[in-house]
């Protein structure tokens, strides 16, 4: 049996010999995007760059595009080009002109300061970034507080907080407490603006209200809690891993709710204030903090 070499066959059909051996690989071609950026001579996580970008464009009238942001980043000491700046801003929905379109009109905050006369009258929620030193990246903490008692009813700590996480959290809270008639205050984050989140709250007969842009004081209770958390826990520890950070958060939340006394509550704990609102309900008094 006569055999013909690959080179001969390739020559007959007019193809390069290398074509025979080529096997395309799955996934996108080219070099993988970098996960770190050079900052003042040291490699830092891209999450630090993203936080720097958020800070640069945080002003209420700031309309910087990615090119202006790139110039500012380089002035701060980041060794980064426009292409990478664009990619990071695009991935995190920070590009100018990225508009979140939601169905129906938003109900805006009417009164800057919330006055709650009972538990589950007002809830407020917000997202905070927590730096995990050992992994060189940020994690997201979503907390929801009962305004009357300042008690943290639920919190989520993970790599990202999506609309599905907010939906699951609201469903869990509804099963435990019944959110009918509850007013829920939040900022204008994409997770809270999502049509599915707004539709769920309508279905649960809860009322959602949005703070005005660049007015964190309208959500002052949860903002104050996150400031306390920053001062009493995050600034005092360097977390080596996600699991270590989560363990510290679990312990802190328990301590905050059940042991930390608040001057504005009359020198009692959030849980004690919560109990005052349910003098005849053992179920409401004993509800623990939910952790995910």
Please name every model-derived segment.
Residues 99, 184-188, 202-221, 237-242:
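RNase H-like polynucleotidyl transferase catalytic core
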Residues 177-194, 216, 266-271:
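Acidic/histidine-rich, metal-coordinating catalytic segments
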Residues 195, 202-206, 228-292:
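C-terminal domain-tail junction helix/linker
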Residues 6-13, 69:
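Short alpha-helical "recognition helix" segments of helix-turn-helix
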Residues 19-121, 215, 269-278:
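Basic, flexible linker segments flanking DNA-binding modules
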Residues 59, 79-143, 164-172, 176-181, ...:
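Mobile-element integrase/transposase regions
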